[in-house]
Regions:
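N-terminal, polar/charged subdomain of small-to-medium soluble alpha/beta proteins
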Residues: 1-117
Length: 117
């Protein structure tokens, strides 16, 4: 099998996540970066993972459920992306801009890596 890595960065989405009181009441902004290793043996779009579908899958994973931990969101995104056809491995980095601002840092993010089926 021949593989390549896709880097999909700055996927903007929103969700109801957080451990602090009130964080789940209103949707918050999240930004997802994906590093996805895909099977490219066939050299055709039908034989690998369409990056548009990977982006849609990442957004749906953030928007679908509610989590307390940023780490759990990253794991859910990586799991969902890794389950897509043609994916060998998926790493999701989920950024929470509001957490960075409230802590006076440049960024707050969590990452998770999951092997494909």
């Amino acid at each position: 099998m021949s593989t390549a890595r896709l880097f999909l960065t700055g996927i903007r989405t929103s969700g109801h996540h957080g451990a602090n009181p009130g964080e789940k009441d209103q949707a918050q902004d999240f930004v997802v970066d994906l590093d996805v290793e895909v099977d490219v043996t066939a050299d055709r779009i039908g034989g690998t993972s369409d990056y548009r579908e990977l982006i849609r899958t990442a957004r749906e994973a953030v928007e679908r459920e509610r989590f307390d931990l940023l780490e759990s969101i990253a794991d859910a995104v990586a799991e969902a992306v890794a389950a897509r056809p043609g994916v060998v491995r998926a790493t999701a980095v989920v950024h929470k801009p509001a957490a960075a601002r409230s802590n006076d840092v440049d960024g707050v993010a969590a990452a998770a890596t999951v092997e494909g089926d």
